[in-house]
Amino acid sequence: MLKKKKTEVYALGEHISMSADKARRVIDQIRGRSYEETLMILELMPYRACYPILKLVYSAAANASYNMGSSEANLVISKAEVNGGTTVKKLKPRARGRSFPIKRSTCHITIVMKDISLNDEYVKMNSLKKTRWKKKSTAMTYHDMYNSGGLWDKK
């Protein structure tokens, strides 16, 4: 029996004092990219959300090297999500005894990294299995999209 080896590690940052929408703007740029490419993108982007996300990416890579012994060159961000956290509500005193509410939003950021070198071994093992539903023959048809024989082809 083959024991399935763990291929994913994650880093979780909770109660980061930032709007979830502002953090999502940065997370959408790095989702699905490699570790080195992610570091370059995060260091060059001019947003405040980049620094806590960069710390989480470093932490996830350290988790991968410590827990699985994998190299940083083989890591890919497979899943990155931002969820809204708690909202800190305060009152700001104003003139004439009034007060205005202040809402300070927080977010939770989760970054999941996958080691693609371990994933290739499973692809090799699964390719040895015989597929039963594979089609016998596939015929390719070529369609000329520039010369469709319509009205506009005639001069």
UniProtKB/Swiss-Prot annotation:
Q: Does the keyword Protease apply?
A: no
Task: Please give the superkingdom of this protein's source.
Answer: Eukaryota
Provide one Gene Ontology cellular component: large ribosomal subunit
Gene Ontology MF annotations? rRNA binding; structural constituent of ribosome
Stretches that traverse the bilayer: none
Entry keyword set:
Chloroplast, Plastid, Ribonucleoprotein, Ribosomal protein, RNA-binding, rRNA-binding
| InterPro entries linked to this entry | Ribosomal_uL22, Ribosomal_uL22_bac/chlpt-type, Ribosomal_uL22_bac/org-type, Ribosomal_uL22_CS, Ribosomal_uL22_sf
Q: Name one GO biological process term.
A: translation
SUPFAM superfamilies given for it?
Ribosomal protein L22
Q: Where in the cell is it found?
A: Plastid, Chloroplast
Q: Which PROSITE patterns match?
A: RIBOSOMAL_L22
User: What job does this protein perform?
Assistant: This protein binds specifically to 23S rRNA.
Report the sequence similarity comment from the record.
Belongs to the universal ribosomal protein uL22 family.
| NCBIfam families the record matches | rplV_bact (TIGR01044)
Describe the subunit structure: Part of the 50S ribosomal subunit.
Task: Output this protein's name.
Answer: Large ribosomal subunit protein uL22c
**Species in which this protein is naturally found:** Atropa belladonna (Belladonna)
Lineage of origin: Eukaryota, Viridiplantae, Streptophyta, Embryophyta, Tracheophyta
